[in-house]
Amino acid sequence: MNVSALANFRVQPMLACESHEILGFELLYRHRVDFTNRRQMLEVDIEALKAARFLCTAYKSKLRVHCNVEASSMLNLDWVVAMAEHMVPGMVIEIVERN
């Protein structure tokens, strides 16, 4: 896995309020998503898993990396398989409702 996994994401740091120490990152898709297109949202959600894995691996799981998943994607076998393949310590999956 290489840095190209991050190509479609902005990496937003999460900071401690007093020390401003980086506690983790949130991955945000950098393009518009058609929220009526479940297939497109599924592809974005799978891509987010791969990007989160890349960051967790790069930081040796010492920082939390948050990625979003649409609730409907979690019911899709493709997402479940991707999650099983890419989940590593440090990843946080946030369930979102985009529409």
Predicted feature locations:
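The catalytic core of metal-dependent phosphodiesterases that act on cyclic dinucleotides
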Residues: A84-N99
